[in-house]
A protein has these predicted regions:
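Glycine-rich, phosphate-binding/catalytic loops in enzymes
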Residues: 3-4, 147-148, 177
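Metal-coordinating catalytic core of metallo-dependent amide/deamination hydrolases
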Residues: 25-44, 48-49, 56-170
Length: 189
C-alpha cells in the first residue's frame, strides 16, 4: 500500500483513502487472492528479517482476510511460523478490523459470522491468543465491540482493542471493563 503512504504524506485522511478503495479493504482483497503457501513464504521472509535484527518476540495479527477462509488462512500461517521458528510468536485475531463490502448493508450478519463461524474454528484449531476489535465510527460501534469481545473471552481469548484513532466514542471504557491487555491508537482523547 505504498501509494496510500504517499497519499497520507500529501494530506489525505485515512477515511478519504478508504473511501477511494484503499485501506483495509484493499489489503483484504489482495490477501484473499494470495494462497496460504505464498502468504507463509512472504511472512517467513519478514520474520527472518526481524529475527536477524535481534527481535526476540512478535505479535502477528489477522484482520486482513475479513472472510472465514481469509482470517483462518492468516491465523494458520501464524501458527505454522510459531511452530517452525524459535522466536516467541503470539497470534491476535482481528476479524473485527472492518466490515467487508459484502456486509456493508448488513453489519450484524458479519458480526454473527465472527462469533458463530470464525471464533469456534479458531478455538478448535487453537489459532489465537488474543482477540482485537477496531472500535471507531464507521467501523465497529461500542455495543458491537462489547459483543465481539465477550464472545472472544468465552473462547478463551484475551481482549485487546484499537480505539480513539479518529474519535472518542467510549471504546476505552469497554477495554477497561473487559480487562483488555491493551488499548491501542489513542490518537484522540
Amino acid at each position: 500500500r505504498e501509494q496510500e503512504f504517499v497519499d497520507r504524506i500529501n494530506g489525505l485522511t485515512y477515511e478519504e483513502i478508504a473511501n477511494r478503495g484503499g485501506g483495509i479493504l484493499n489489503s483484504a482483497q489482495k490477501l484473499n487472492a494470495t494462497s496460504e503457501e505464498e502468504l507463509y513464504h512472504q511472512s517467513e521472509e519478514r520474520l527472518k528479517e526481524v529475527i536477524q535484527l535481534g527481535t526476540g518476540a512478535v505479535e502477528i495479527k489477522s484482520g486482513y482476510g475479513l472472510t472465514v477462509e481469509g482470517e483462518l488462512k492468516m491465523l494458520r500461517v501464524i501458527k505454522k511460523l510459531a511452530s517452525n521458528y524459535p522466536i516467541a510468536i503470539k497470534a491476535t485475531f482481528l476479524g473485527a478490523h472492518a466490515f467487508p463490502s459484502l456486509f456493508k448493508d448488513n453489519k450484524e450478519a458479519y458480526i454473527d459470522v465472527i462469533i458463530n463461524e470464525m471464533l469456534p474454528e479458531i478455538a478448535k484449531e487453537n489459532l489465537a491468543d488474543f482477540i482485537d476489535v477496531f472500535c471507531e465510527n464507521g467501523y465497529f460501534t461500542v455495543a458491537q465491540t462489547e459483543k465481539i469481545i465477550a464472545a472472544g473471552i468465552q473462547y478463551g481469548l484475551q481482549p485487546k482493542m484499537h480505539v480513539n484513532q479518529f474519535n472518542s466514542i467510549g471504546g476505552i471504557q469497554i477495554g477497561v471493563q473487559n480487562k483488555a491487555l491493551s488499548v491501542d491508537h489513542l490518537e484522540v482523547m
